[in-house]
Amino acid sequence: MNNYTIKDITRASGGFAMLAVDQREAMRLMFAAAGAKTPVADSVLTDFKVNAAKILSPYASAVLLDQQFCYRQAVEQNAVAKSCAMIVAADDFIPGNGIPVDNVVLDKKINAQAVKRDGAKALKLLVLWRSDEDAQQRLNMVKEFNELCHSNGLLSIIEPVVRPPRCGDKFDREQAIIDAAKELGDSGADLYKVEMPLYGKGARSDLLTASQRLNGHINMPWVILSSGVDEKLFPRAVRVAMEAGASGFLAGRAVWSSVIGLPDTELMLRDVSAPKLQRLGEIVDEMMAKRR
């Protein structure tokens, strides 16, 4: 059996410059907020995702697709560049309490062998972390996910995202990110996708300290995501996180959110989003070169 390794989803430098287009109801809300005709049809999301994969994947070491809206179509249309690995989301998002993702379970419909035949090299699992929910349940889900990936020769990418507790209103996001890393940072996955401390804001020295603290609890390669980070601050966030020990990024919003809802989508992705992704890839290579 062919077992993929981390090198299969990195750039030649050994760093990760990966594009996410697996946002689901959150992306629908973004289109609505940008003035798109509501209700926003599934086809609007599918078209955007497939276009983004076609136009941006040549500049990414991997692209993350979701089964709900775009994976099948991307495979059928050969949307992903040969030079870019494919990652498939194996999480089922459950909406509730007025938010698009209130709970997450491992998608039982995922067929690991079939996605591997289609060219996927990794699966990704979102793990919602709340201080007042059962840690063992999270660990069990990650263990089951890792087994699914590794028994099929696929890489396992986990994405712990912190949320306020179900009960009570005390929520320290920064501490929660650290606590989630303490719990899941040595859980046997191949890659840890994490929220940027401090939303990438403020003094560089503070960001570096927070990122170094995070690095101390993650016992596997890690990358940052861009949700919640101003896209203008994201390149700096990548630099600082990598200085602290991260190995790159797996991000969507910082690359393409500014073109959502604009006319001439393909043109916008080519002229606005592609240069952003190219630059981020250069930053990753630059930071990896400093490690040699």
Swiss-Prot record:
Q: InterPro entries attached here?
A: Aldolase_TIM, DeoC/FbaB/LacD_aldolase, LacD_aldolase, SFP_aldolase_YihT
What residues make up the catalytic site?
193 (schiff-base intermediate with substrate)
What EC number(s) does its UniProt record assign? 4.1.2.57
Gene name in the database record: yihT
Subunit text: Homotetramer.
The family database entries (CDD domains) matched by this protein are listed as: Aldolase_Class_I
What is the reaction catalyzed? Answer: 6-deoxy-6-sulfo-D-fructose 1-phosphate = (2S)-3-sulfolactaldehyde + dihydroxyacetone phosphate
Organism, as annotated = Salmonella typhimurium (strain LT2 / SGSC1412 / ATCC 700720)
User: Member of which family?
Assistant: Belongs to the aldolase LacD family.
Q: Name one GO biological process term.
A: 6-sulfoquinovose(1-) catabolic process
Alphabetical keyword list? Carbohydrate metabolism, Lyase, Schiff base
* Role description: Cleaves 6-deoxy-6-sulfo-D-fructose 1-phosphate (SFP) to form dihydroxyacetone phosphate (DHAP) and 3-sulfolactaldehyde (SLA). Can also catalyze the reverse reaction.
* Name under which the protein is recorded: Sulfofructosephosphate aldolase
Broad enzyme group? lyase
- Alphabetized GO MF terms: 6-deoxy-6-sulfofructose-1-phosphate aldolase activity
